């Protein structure tokens, strides 16, 4: 999506299967996107970038706060001076009060799933077993459903914890929005989008007013996207 807006993109994922799917979409889109097979806790780039974007509650998969602080430190390291970091996360409130211990099942025609959820409040760990039934073939050729099973572990974080971890990594918190309402995040937000900024690096001394104005416009575009 962002490549379609004209941004030069680098994609990082720890799953070869996910990257393979991404590369298939890249081929279909015609965009020039670099993909890297890396663990976010140890990711390396070839230089700094103007923005880092993390979506689909990826940070919740980092279940140790110390490791998440290291992820944020790496983000800060690879951001340009004043660069933006945008990410979303599921809150502890959502896991504790909304999800809890439950089973969710849904039939979507070509695929169905069973989601068995369990939240361990003391450890702040949400575990869910996901069983998928994916349709293959057509009715004319004898369609069948192939079964897949996955187990996921995610940690519930509060916004206060996220802000403290950002600060410990040298990033400056800018804003947090409830992803259901678009309004400012509050204590009962289930999913939050956070905007943070790098502030520790100095821009090149030769940067003139025109260049700085251009960077300001590009940063504004990143916020709007």
Predicted segment positions?
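SAM-dependent methyltransferase
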Residues: 86-165, 225
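C-terminal lobe and adjacent flexible extensions of AdoMet/dcAdoMet transferase-like proteins
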Residues: 153-212, 221-225
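Class I SAM-dependent methyltransferase SAM/SAH-binding core
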Residues: 1-42
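Conserved beta-strand segments of alpha/beta enzyme cores
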Residues: 8, 32-34, 112, 172-175
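A short acidic, Gly/Pro-enriched loop at the edge of an enzyme's catalytic core
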Residues: 41-51
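A short glycine-rich, Lys/Arg-flanked "PGG" loop and its adjoining helix->strand segment in the class I
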Residues: 69-84
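A short, glycine/Asx- and small/polar-enriched loop/turn
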Residues: 49, 124-126, 187-192
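A short SAM/SAH-binding and catalytic strip from SAM-dependent methyltransferases
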Residues: 49-67
């Amino acid at each position: 999506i962002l490549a379609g807006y004209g941004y030069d993109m680098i994609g990082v994922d720890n799953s070869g299967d996910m990257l393979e799917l991404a590369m298939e979409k890249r081929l279909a889109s015609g965009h020039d996107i670099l993909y890297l097979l890396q663990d976010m806790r140890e990711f390396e780039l070839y230089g700094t970038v103007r923005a880092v974007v993390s979506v689909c509650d990826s940070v919740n998969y980092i279940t140790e706060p110390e490791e998440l602080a290291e992820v944020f430190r790496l983000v800060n390291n690879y951001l340009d001076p004043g660069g933006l970091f945008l990410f979303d996360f599921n809150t502890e409130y959502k896991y504790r009060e909304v999800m809890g211990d439950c089973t969710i099942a849904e039939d979507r025609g070509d695929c169905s799933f069973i989601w068995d959820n369990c939240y361990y409040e003391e450890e702040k760990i949400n575990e869910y077993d996901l069983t998928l039934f994916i349709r293959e073939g057509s009715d004319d050729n004898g369609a069948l459903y192939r079964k897949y099973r996955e187990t996921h572990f995610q940690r519930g974080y509060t916004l206060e914890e996220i802000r403290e971890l950002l600060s410990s990594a040298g990033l400056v918190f800018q804003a947090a929005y409830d992803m259901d309402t678009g309004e400012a995040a509050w204590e009962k937000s289930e999913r939050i989008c956070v905007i943070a900024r790098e502030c520790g690096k100095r821009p090149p001394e030769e940067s003139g007013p025109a260049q700085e104005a251009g960077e300001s416009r590009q940063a504004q575009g990143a916020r709007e996207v």
